Amino acid sequence: MIEKRKEEHIRIAENENVSAFHNYWDDVYLMHEADPEVNYDDIDTGVDFLGKHLGFPMVISSMTGGAEIAKKINYNLATVAEKYQLAMGVGSMRAAIVNRSLSDTYSVINERNVPIKIANIGAPQLVPQGKEAIDEKDIAYIYDLIKADFLAVHFNFLQEMVQPEGDRNAEGVIKRIKELSGSFNIIAKETGSGFSKATAQRLADAGVKAIEVSGLSGTTFAAVEYYRAKNEGNAEKMRIGETFWNWGIPSPASVYYCSDVLPVIGSGGLRNGLDLAKAISLGASLGGFARTLLKDADQSVEAVSRNVEMIEREFKVAMFLTGNKNVYELRKTKKVIGEPLKEWMEV
């Protein structure tokens, strides 16, 4: 059943409109410098993140695994991550715990030298859901499976509310994270609805190392699950998905809130290198791309490479036009915030 759901998620994300109605990165404007006083060829896009060096401040965000079609996608993404020295996450690894025969759909990334590898498990699986929660041995298995540097714990409770088979219990998640943080380097990750500053602080107090905001702007899993419910003829879940299609904290606002608390991966609706530059300017350490790369990854390494090369070029152009020689200078660049994002930034 999990494998079928993974396949459905991939095909829906590729073929349906599952984006939020507004991309809030369009409300961020970087200040242009007519005389940048920078040599484009000397611009340094390298960055250090939690003790690891990357050639470019980009994460291939967690997307897939647990289905045969995911194996090729993860292999292609890992090949590109090695080539351009990018961080990479895999999709939820619950499938590998339930069915070990699916493990190679994740471990395939070990065939490439990815500088930062991020394992992945859902926050709902950390607490009982009518059955026992996964234990530390299960998490150690998936962590070791891809020789991970970090464990992403993804918070997808909106998705769970729309899923026909969704989990309903969130009580005790922070407690479990605190227990696990002594054994694993944890990154808290949303899946399209963002984190508030208060939640970020609770996670920091529980020992989380960083946050991937994955806020409202790009793919919304309420929409993904709306289409699954539609295909299954589940009118109740369709209505919930439609009602909460645009639920969440805008990605740029979530970056702004959380960057005072923990290192942040800005994600949720990033489409190009300019969006990435905007995320860095708001306080993100890295930017995460997912659906932007998915169709290419389903085709070939070359297709993903072309996309990543364009993202990097656009990012450098944005750095040049704002007069910044390195990523650390970009974080201080002047910006203008437009409506409706401005209201969120003032909360």
Swiss-Prot record:
Record-level Gene Ontology MF annotations: FMN binding; isopentenyl-diphosphate delta-isomerase activity; magnesium ion binding; NADPH binding; oxidoreductase activity
Reaction(s) this enzyme catalyzes, per UniProt: isopentenyl diphosphate = dimethylallyl diphosphate
Stated family: Belongs to the IPP isomerase type 2 family.
List of residues binding FMN: S61, S62, M63, T64, S92, N120, K189, S214, T219, G269, L270, R271, A290, R291
Protein known as: Isopentenyl-diphosphate delta-isomerase
Binding-site list for Mg(2+): E160
Gene: fni
GO cellular component term of the entry, any: cytoplasm
Binding site for substrate: R5, K6, S92, M93, R94, Q159
Record EC number: 5.3.3.2
Main subcellular location of this protein, as a coarse class: cytoplasm
Cofactor(s) needed by this chain: FMN; NADPH; Mg(2+)
Lineage, broadest ranks: Archaea, Methanobacteriati, Thermoplasmatota, Thermoplasmata, Thermoplasmatales
Single biological process term from Gene Ontology: isoprenoid biosynthetic process
Function of the protein: Involved in the biosynthesis of isoprenoids. Catalyzes the 1,3-allylic rearrangement of the homoallylic substrate isopentenyl (IPP) to its allylic isomer, dimethylallyl diphosphate (DMAPP).
Broad class of enzyme this protein falls into: isomerase
Cellular location(s): Cytoplasm
InterPro entries the record matches: Aldolase_TIM, FMN-dep_DH, IPdP_isomerase
Subunit structure: Homooctamer. Dimer of tetramers.
UniProt keyword list: Cytoplasm, Flavoprotein, FMN, Isomerase, Isoprene biosynthesis, Magnesium, Metal-binding, NADP
Superkingdom of origin organism: Archaea
